[in-house]
From Swiss-Prot:
It is found in: Cytoplasm. The active site is at K192. This is Glycerol-3-phosphate dehydrogenase [NAD(P)+]. Pathway: Membrane lipid metabolism; glycerophospholipid metabolism. Sn-glycerol 3-phosphate binds at K106, G137, S139, K192, D245, S255, R256, N257. GO terms for biological process: carbohydrate metabolic process; glycerol-3-phosphate biosynthetic process; glycerol-3-phosphate catabolic process; glycerophospholipid metabolic process; phospholipid biosynthetic process.
């Protein structure tokens, strides 16, 4: 039995805590809202982020980070990307032994454009890190909470570490594959949020299935293009954390990014959308980070650039569609030296 603390009591952190508890592990969950932690402990529900789902009685919630981390050997980080450094800086003052650091957040750090595993390795001393592992894939918290069949990927530099996390989570409704491509897995999970925003805009504008299919397909091309430039394996983007996550995020009403894009397509401002959502929409921050990365690394990402102009430069969504459709003629298939 593993002693594991989930850092972050949002919908995804809560759902993953359920999986771990169902597997018989000693599970704690930490959140910074005492009233929510009390509700989890007394009513066995997280009514704010995962309403209607009864949580296992073995999950213990804490609002004290120090108490939540007593004697743990594994932590699972599920917090917004912008909060990582603050949380990690607190944690490194509490943790005293090397532990496994798993993260299940899908984003790129604002300002630095770094992957979350890079942030962890920068903030946590090497003496406190046993392994850093990423857990990602097409997975809505609402469906995991209902024990609906879900499949994700565990990625780490050491395959033994990825397999260890696979063993932690795998059960009859939650299947885990392994992948050594931590760069590709992280980028696929983060960048698909950009395309989900664009797909939501397309649906909000009523552009139809043809346009949405094109956005998803060409969007995957952009993800793979930047991912390969940053060291990811092109094949990863055809897997669960690339194509798989893109499909589920672009087509489901559970997707925050799709819902946010849908509101933008219907004429709402970004400020109205973010206020209405009440939860983190990682795609907004990721669009900015990816646009900066693309310019820095000279990678062509036209959908990302068009969305960036809508979100941050006030461009009209209909004009953005026109600019994409009117681009110079191109070949569809690009030669990838690694594969050809």
């Amino acid at each position: 039995m593993t002693k594991i603390t989930v850092i972050g009591a949002g919908s995804w952190g809560t759902a993953l805590a359920m999986v771990l508890a169902d597997n018989g592990h000693d599970v704690r969950i930490w959140g910074n809202r005492p009233e929510l932690m009390n509700e989890i402990n007394t009513k066995r529900e997280n009514s704010r982020y995962l309403p209607g789902i009864t949580l296992p009685s073995t999950i213990v919630a804490y609002s004290s980070l120090e108490e939540a981390l007593v004697d743990v050997n594994t932590v699972l980080l599920v917090v917004p990307t912008k909060a990582y450094r603050d949380v990690l800086q607190e944690m490194k003052e509490i943790v005293t032994e090397p532990i496994t650091w798993i993260h299940a957040s899908k984003g790129i750090e604002p300002g630095t454009s770094k992957r979350i595993s890079e942030v962890i390795e920068e903030e946590i001393p090497e003496s406190l890190i046993k392994d850093v592992v990423v857990l990602s894939g097409p997975s809505h918290a609402e469906e995991v909470g209902l024990h609906q069949a879900t499949t994700v990927t565990s990625a780490a530099k050491r395959m033994e570490a990825a397999e260890g996390v696979q063993d932690l989570f795998m059960n009859s409704y939650f299947r885990v594959y392994t992948n050594p491509d931590i760069v590709g897995v992280e980028l696929g999970g983060a960048l698909k949020n950009i395309i989900a925003l664009a797909a939501g805009i397309s649906d909000g504008l009523g552009l139809g299935d043809n346009a949405k299919a094109a956005l998803m397909t060409r969007g995957l091309t952009e993800i793979a293009r930047l991912g390969r430039k940053m060291g990811g394996n092109p094949l990863t983007f055809a897997g669960l954390t690339g194509m798989g996550d893109l499909i589920v995020t672009c087509t489901s009403v559970h997707s925050r990014n799709w819902r946010a894009g849908n509101m933008l397509g219907k004429g709402h401002s970004l400020e109205e959308v973010l206020e209405s959502m009440g939860m983190v929409v990682e795609g907004v921050r990721t669009t900015k980070a990816a646009h900066e990365l693309a310019e820095k690394m000279e990678v062509e990402m036209p959908i990302t650039a068009a969305l960036y102009d809508v979100l941050f430069n006030g461009n009209n969504v209909k004009d953005a569609v026109g600019s994409l459709m009117g681009r110079v003629r191109k070949h569809e298939v690009e030669a990838i030296p690694d594969l050809l």
